[in-house]
Amino acid sequence: MAELLASLPAWAAVLLLFFATVSGSTGPRSRENRGASRIPSQFSEEERVAIKEALKGAIQIPTVSFSHEESNTTALAEFGEYIRKAFPTVFHSSLVQHEVVAKYSHLFTIQGSDPSLQPYMLMAHIDVVPAPEEGWEVPPFSGLERNGFIYGRGALDNKNSVMAILHALELLLIRNYSPKRSFFIALGHDEEVSGEKGAQKISALLQARGVQLAFLVDEGSFILEGFIPNLEKPVAMISVTEKGALDLMLQVNMTPGHSSAPPKETSIGILSAAVSRLEQTPMPNMFGGGPLKKTMKLLANEFSFPINIVLRNLWLFHPIVSRIMERNPITNALVRTTTALTMFNAGIKVNVIPPLAQATINCRIHPSQTVHEVLELVKNTVADDRVQLHVLRSFEPLPISPSDDQAMGYQLLQETIRSVFPEVDIVVPGICIANTDTRHYANITNGMYRFNPLPLNPQDFSGVHGINEKVSVQNYQNQVKFIFEFIQNADTYKEPVPHLHEL
């Protein structure tokens, strides 16, 4: 048993270091939905060079979102002009309607020939987080290519998806492709600071037009390589849900005074005690209440003894595994709502008892809980009427999108993954513990999938929102190929025969 416990922590601690965790089924490989007439995803050398050069140019435009109130609007406007020049066929095709939404976001409507087919949507975001130059091997907005990699902020988050989607469409249109199924491309400009000015406005526009999507695909999970010890195979993970959020301000007001005659408790002391209680009293462990437990059982066959035995018998080892998951910050976030103190403000002068103390708490809500439940738990833990709670922002965890053999979006992603990446045998759904723009579209589809068709290893992952963000030229070209194939697969998709219980 000691050896078994020693093996598990290392495995569990890195189960998902990229903001997602797995759940679901691996399913058999199937290509029966493919049509006989397809445009092969074979690009000329000139086209392959153009693919990488277009991404380099996109990275060079610093479309930074600094805060909800501040973004580089000059760069956002420049980016709009850039994509017009980079993809002339897209912008001049009679099949494509382009609209600028909320000044800097973009909505493309690609008209299909069969109006009976429900449309879908491909998503990405134009904005990036700030990138101070310190520590970078190259300037963060240079888009330089070194040793087969393109460097720069947005190379993985999320200029790569913006450009890959548009480039795939450009290449299809150049080859006179006419889609059967209509689809949309939505490019938000403020995802890094909530998406309320971009994606939310696009969603409202589509809702006003009565659009209902079969599914959407946004950023999220990757094809993981080297993240899970003892598992040599790459694992493609498609996030089918994501955590909710609750931002709270805790505030204590007291009568100010001179520090020479202090009261028994100050506003700082009262608030500090409340915050300490929150840190020392974590939210309930929800392991078993979400898809993670099911996934571990599924992945059991991929591991050797003793891990496979544990994962096949969670009915017995549930308490051990759930406790192990708590030991690492990443895996802890997979099994519970997290509570993080992010700001603390108090004090005006060294000899003055402060009249006001404020702290800001960020909660990321597990899919098995609600905003109301978490708020009540916070109140019960603080347990002090002198501490006022103010909700600054909140939204519920997103519903879990279907991932069975009846789920069109999931099945199309799985089929395309296995076609473009034949080395990938394992495709599973997951939970995104970060937030994306998908939540703004929950009213127009129940199929929301988050997947970046790129292999990712721990070293490359460290560049996301960090230093030396980069993408392999070959991997990026394969991302374009993936979308090129995906659009065609969506046209040839055959609705599955309903299960007997659905008839």
UniProtKB/Swiss-Prot annotation:
Disruption phenotype: Genetic ablation causes tissue-specific bidirectional dysregulation of several N-acyl amino acids. Locomotor activity and resting energy requirements (RER) are slightly increased and decreased, respectively, in PM20D1-KO mice on chow diet, while diet-induced obesity conditions produce a marked impairment in glucose homeostasis and insulin sensitivity in these mice. They also exhibit enhanced defense of body temperature in cold, and antinociceptive behaviors selectively in response to chemical and inflammatory pain stimuli while maintaining normal thermal pain sensation and normal movement. It is an enzyme of class 3 (hydrolase). GO terms for cellular component: extracellular space. It catalyses: an N-acyl-L-amino acid + H2O = an L-alpha-amino acid + a carboxylate; an N-acyl-aromatic L-alpha-amino acid + H2O = an aromatic L-alpha-amino acid + a carboxylate; N-(5Z,8Z,11Z,14Z)-eicosatetraenoyl-glycine + H2O = (5Z,8Z,11Z,14Z)-eicosatetraenoate + glycine; N-hexadecanoyl-L-phenylalanine + H2O = hexadecanoate + L-phenylalanine. It is found in: Secreted. Glycans are attached at residues 72, 443. The active site is at 127, 191 (proton acceptor). Zn(2+) 1 binds at residues 157, 192, 465. Its cofactor is Zn(2+). PANTHER family: N-FATTY-ACYL-AMINO ACID SYNTHASE/HYDROLASE PM20D1, N-FATTY-ACYL-AMINO ACID SYNTHASE_HYDROLASE PM20D1. This is N-fatty-acyl-amino acid synthase/hydrolase PM20D1. It comes from Mus musculus (Mouse).
